[in-house]
Structure formats: C-alpha cells, structure tokens
Amino acid sequence: MKAIKILCAAALMAATAAVSGAQNMYDAINISRNEYYGTARTMALGNAVTAIGGDVGSFGINPAGSAVANYNQLVITPGISVSVVGASYSPSGESGFGPEYGYDRTRMTLPNFGATAVLYTGRSRGLKSFTFGLISNQTAQYNYYADAYGQTSLSSKAAEFAAAAAGLDESMLVGNSAYDNGISWDIISAYQSGMFGSYGKGSNYVGVTETIDESGAWHYVPGPLAQHSAVQKWGSKNDVIVNFGMNFSDKVFFGINVGFPYATYGYSESFYESSVNPEQFPIIYNLDDGSQVETYFLSSSFSNRYIADMSGIYAKIGVIVTPFEGLRLGAAIQTPAMYTITEHWQYSATTSFADDYFSGYANSPEGEYSYNLMTPYSANFGVAWTFGDRAFVSVDYELTDYSVMRYHELHPGGAPMNDIFFDVNETNRHFAGVAHNLRIGAELRLTPGFSLRAGYGVATSPVRHWTNNMGDDVTADDFLAEYEDYYLSGLKYLVDSRYYGDRTRSLSFGVGFSSRGSFFADLGAVLTSYPDSVFMPYYDYDNFDAEGNPVNAASPRILNRSKLWNVALTIGWRF
C-alpha cells in the first residue's frame, strides 16, 4: 500500500498542475522559444541577417535593419506549413518500437506583412535619415499531428486511473461534490464515465480493463488491449513590431523595436483502448435489487483539450556597422517579454460495453486560469562579407538564457515562500539553461533581377539535468516532484549539471526576383528537423500480474520523429 500511496500522491500532484493549466518549465520554454519566419528572403537565408538588414523580415532579428534600406517598403508574405511526423509504439520501455506511422498536416500561414517609411534629413553626413516601420513577423508555428497504435497486456489507462484514485472516498468522485474536494477533474471524469469503479470494502478501485482475482486480493489486465494515442497542436505566435531606425553616414545604423507578441496555442491529446478479445474482460455489475449482470468491456477513450491565449510586450535594440567596404557587423539584444496568458481546458471520457446500458460518458467543466510569464532575454551577433552587389555570406550567433523565466500570479500577495509558482520557478532556474543558435546564409545575384539563396541553422536545447548529493540523475520533473519534501529542506541538493545533446536543425533555400520598377518577389522554403521525442500517454503505476506478484505496470512509450516544412512567397513594392 505504501507504494500505491506514493503513486497516488504523484498522480494527484501532476493532475493538480493540469487543473490550473499547464505552467511548468517545458511550457515556459515552448512559449518563449522563437523560430523566426519573416519574409521569404530571410527564411531562405536561414535568418542569418543580423549584419545584413534592409529586408522587412530582418527587423525582428535586428531592429537596425530598417535603417539600412533607403526606400519605403510595403510587403506581404503568405505561406504554407506542412508538419510531417512519424510515430511508433512500444508496449514497455524505450525499446521494441513497432512500425512507424507517418502523418502530415498542411496549414495556411501568414509569416510576415508590414510597411516602412523613410524620412531624409537632407544631410550628407551624420544623421542622414529616419525609418519608421510597422511589421508583423511570425516567430512560432504550432502545427503538429501524431498518431500511434499498438497492443499490450501489461497496463492500461483505465487501470492507471484506478491506481491514482486509491484511498479516495468514493463519495468524493460523484455528483457536484467534485467541485469542492480538490481532486483533479481527469480522475473524476474517468470515474463518472465508468472507466473504473470500486470493489470490496474501503477505497479500493479497479479499472474496467482489469479482472479481479477470485480471492479479491488483487487485479490485473487479463488480455491484450489495442491502444491508440493521438496528439495534435495548432496555432501560431506573432510579433507586431513598432520600429524606429536611424542611419548615420551610411556607416552606422541603429534601431529600436517595441514588440507586442500575441499567440494562440492549442493542444489536444486523445487515448483509446479496446479489448482484442472482449470475452477476456468480463464485468459483473451488482444491481440495487441484489441481482448481478455480466457484460464485457469493449472500449474506452479519454481526451483533454487545452487552449492558451497570450499577449505581451518587450523591447529590442540593435546596431549594424560597416567599418570598411565588404565587412558588416551587427548586434542586438532583446529584453525579457512579459506575457499575460489565459488558459482553458476540459477533459472528456467514454466507456463502451457489450451491454450498451452500462456504457457511459462524462465531460468535466471547462477550466480557466490566467497568470503572467516573464520570458528570457536574448542577444544575437552577426558578421557578413559582401562581394560588391553580387553576393554575400552571413553568419549569426544567438544566445538565449531560459533560466530567467518566471511565472507570476496576476494578483500576488503574501511572502515569497507562499508564491504558488515558487517551486516551478526554482525548477526553471536550475533546469532551464542557455540555448545557442548558429545560423549561416548566402546570396548570389545571377543577374540584376534574379538571385539564389541558401541557409543552414542549428540550435541547442536549453534543458539540462543534474546529479544530486545522493548520486541520482535528476530531471526537471524529478526535482519538482520532490522539491518540498527533499530539496527545500536540504535533505537533497543539486551538485552538477549537464545539458542534453538535442539539436534542432534547419536547411533553407530560395530565389528572388526584382523588377526594374518597384515590384519584387521572393520564394523561400525551410525544412526544420526536430529531435526525436518519447511520450508517455499515462503514468507508470504499481499493480499485479495474474499470479498476484507485484509488478510495475509501465505505460507504453510513443516515439515521435518530427519535421516541419515552411514555404513562403513574399510580394512587395519599394518606392
């Protein structure tokens, strides 16, 4: 029972986090991360434009880029985003994955639009011109769909819910009392749909995917279950930028942005399981009149849907210097952004039996929660070499310090130790570190009106793990789960950290056309390859096998391999 109680506490802790939305380190990184899109030209150059400037898509990377162009601009960039994900299923552990199922999903996008105006001072030296701009650049696309299938007789999601509910009084899971008892709505929705129920005396629960031993001493999964896990994401993040630039003698260019990022991020997760042989999953219901009815478990499903709407503000300053012909140097620094985020979420569950009279479904109320998030600061540096007006090569380096991410209540009060985000922010401080991003781009002008472009980028993960004083390897989830009981009291402390070796890589290419008049058009494509990820659709839990031996009922693992294609067409006018 001790092990079950520990599991129950962990499950309830994780569920409580879900009840108040999704405020953990990984969510903060997801919101904070910028993957610049912009115009088709900057995308084709791998966004290695810190020292180049001129293009409207570069202003979000280096505000000084607006001062480089000595003409007004009006541009719009429609595009398409194609998510390609391969998913495979393993019934236990991170080995033995089955066949990979591939899925792609296409969405229309608008990576960029905007306009700039140049005002000349009439001077030939010193401050020659001012530039004002209003631009929208896309900085993230949440386009993702993954689906995996497999069979297992080792565990089930319905049984995991039953294990998580162990020790809870059944009256707390029914009716309107669920509003006030502090139990997570995922457990309540699963119970009210019939995914698990009580048996024997006391607060003992069993999943409808399990069989109870004749002695009533233990329960287990009696046969194979066909399982199906689906995850999808949608939405985008965009920065509306108010830009101001200054040109000093065509040698030094300075710019400042006030950015207003806004985003919608949607996440949906669905899990289905069904009996391969229903006769192996008998269910006996005790009716109020004392009689019994036997039926068979057919299938169950559980899903949660989460949507976050965000808006924020930040500032960014930048400079580009041309010390002598051919060489260009650029640098920019962005302040942390302060976001206000409002989340909505809901759980749904269904259960189906051979006798449809006992089938059920349940939906939780829709939850809502608002809070603030401070994102990291970032700094980028660039160097470029131009070969007259025929070609250039550019290299960028960007640094982002995720350890400064902090969640805040909208209306905080009390001592810092009473901050509901104190443990999460400590996790951010220790387990989110510095991410590095290297970008390379080149352009070759074949004729006065036609150019070829290519780029490459590689970015490191900011996530790290530690060794503690006990010699254990500690992840962010481990630290958060044990923070109050061990790390806050000093019984355990972190000793040495290491970064994971994950890399996100991108390859880009494109072409450009410039007419003799004001019209121009660019076409660009980017292929981004993300690190492989392993996903658990439910928690591991303690259970028994058919002989009554204690076992660790492990959740299946889902391996996802993800790539994202983005193709954009910029049309614009210079005047």
Where are these regions (language model features)?
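Bacterial Sec-dependent N-terminal signal peptides
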Residues: 1-26, 575
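Hydrophobic alpha-helical membrane-insertion segments
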Residues: 11-14, 71, 398, 405
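Short charge-dense sequence patches
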Residues: 12, 57-58, 62, 255
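Outer-membrane beta-barrel porins/channels
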Residues: 23-37, 42, 118-575
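Outer-membrane beta-barrel translocator/receptor signature
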Residues: 40, 52-61, 67-153, 238
